[in-house]
UniProtKB/Swiss-Prot annotation:
Keywords: Acetylation, Actin-binding, Phosphoprotein, Ubl conjugation. Signal peptide: none annotated. Actin-depolymerizing protein. Severs actin filaments (F-actin) and binds to actin monomers (G-actin). Acts in a pH-independent manner. One of its GO terms (cellular component) is postsynapse. Residues 4-153 form the ADF-H domain. This is Destrin. It holds the Pfam family Cofilin_ADF. It comes from Rattus norvegicus. PANTHER family: COFILIN-RELATED. A motif (Nuclear localization signal) lies at residues 30-34.
Length: 165
């Protein structure tokens, strides 16, 4: 079911910047986004970047000790959101970084909000080609390291964001 909701150009630009890793200076790397949260505009017609809801790579280890915990804390308790998270994890063979797309639809969110976000999900996903990992979370219990590691590769994952799973 399509909702007719549009996706802002800035959302597409942020996705591209997160997906494409260029050879960058240390300063440019610090400005790269680790996580970004998207919401519907006030008129509910466009998916936009939620103001102030991002984590920069340069903040990790400086002002943010646990980026995933901080990311989960940025999600509203009683409304839906979309998010991109640049997950860093280790398998038994190697260290990887891959983008994850989240639909956050908590149980306490209004039914209308859940319906609009669910029906608009395809619109934003079409703007994010190549996303390997998509995850819908309905509460904080769905956003723990174990469930995310399971989604990323199950028993092959030994650490997520530097912490063992």
């Amino acid at each position: 079911m399509a909702s007719g909701v549009q996706v802002a150009d800035e959302v597409c630009r942020i996705f591209y910047d997160m997906k494409v890793r260029k050879c960058s200076t240390p300063e440019e790397i610090k400005k790269r986004k680790k996580a970004v949260i998207f919401c519907l505009s006030a008129d509910k017609k466009c998916i936009v970047v939620e103001e102030g809801k991002e984590i920069l790579v340069g903040d990790v280890g400086v002002t943010i000790t646990d980026p995933f915990k901080h990311f989960v804390g940025m999600l509203p308790e009683k409304d839906c959101r979309y998010a991109l998270y640049d997950a860093s994890f280790e398998t038994k063979e190697s260290r990887k970084e891959e983008l994850m797309f989240f639909l956050w639809a908590p149980e306490q969110a209004p039914l209308k909000s859940k319906m609009i976000y669910a029906s608009s999900k395809d619109a934003i996903k079409k703007k994010f080609p190549g996303i390997k990992h998509e995850y819908q979370a309905n509460g904080p219990e769905d956003l723990n390291r174990t469930s995310i590691a399971e989604k990323l590769g199950g028993s092959l994952i030994v650490a997520f964001e530097g912490s063992p799973v």
